[in-house]
Amino acid sequence: MSTVFNGDETAPFFGFLGAAAALVFSCMGAAYGTAKSGVGVASMGVMRPELVMKSIVPVVMAGVLGIYGLIIAVIISTGINPKAKSYYLFDGYAHLSSGLACGLAGLSAGMAIGIVGDAGVRANAQQPKLFVGMILILIFAEALALYGLIVGIILSSRAGQSRAD
């Protein structure tokens, strides 16, 4: 066994688990939001095909959630350096909490965007005045994922601060 690594041997596991959690949970939210609001767009397109391009906004907003998870996963994975002299449990836990914060926020935002997008698109087909209200609610739902992204960046930047050197 090599004596080069001075940190905890289980710490990188938690770091990589955080990267995986960020990507998996965010993409689950993006997939749910895209599917749920896409069903609404498809059913609305039968009645009012001229509104399909206008009603694709919830699908796009849900798809962006996966990018947030990708950003955090890349930040975390670049913070885990196998050639570094140490990677402590504090660092692994910081990366795990970063990934969970971003991933679970993306999952919840995706669920909100999917439900609001589905109902909003169908309602917009019957009453076009509801479009602005739907967009505002979608923006607030997207903000949930942005909060998770910001907290994830802050938490991942905490990794490496446990060293006394």
From Swiss-Prot:
In terms of SUPFAM superfamilies, this protein maps to: F1F0 ATP synthase subunit C
What GO molecular functions are on record for this protein? proton-transporting ATPase activity, rotational mechanism
Keyword terms: Hydrogen ion transport, Ion transport, Membrane, Transmembrane, Transmembrane helix, Transport, Vacuole
Q: Cytoplasmic topology: which positions?
A: 34-55, 118-129
Q: How does it sit in the membrane?
A: Multi-pass membrane protein
State which ranges are Lumenal (membrane side).
Answer: 1-12, 77-95, 156-165
Source taxon at top rank = Eukaryota
Can you list the GO cellular component terms from the UniProt entry?
proton-transporting V-type ATPase, V0 domain; vacuolar membrane
Where along the sequence does the record put site: Essential for proton translocation?
142
Keyword Transmembrane attributed: yes
Assembly, in brief, is: V-ATPase is a heteromultimeric enzyme composed of a peripheral catalytic V1 complex (main components: subunits A, B, C, D, E, and F) attached to an integral membrane V0 proton pore complex (main component: the proteolipid protein; which is present as a hexamer that forms the proton-conducting pore).
Functional summary from the UniProt entry: Proton-conducting pore forming subunit of the membrane integral V0 complex of vacuolar ATPase. V-ATPase is responsible for acidifying a variety of intracellular compartments in eukaryotic cells.
What is the name of this protein?
A: V-type proton ATPase 16 kDa proteolipid subunit
What species is this protein from?
Mesembryanthemum crystallinum
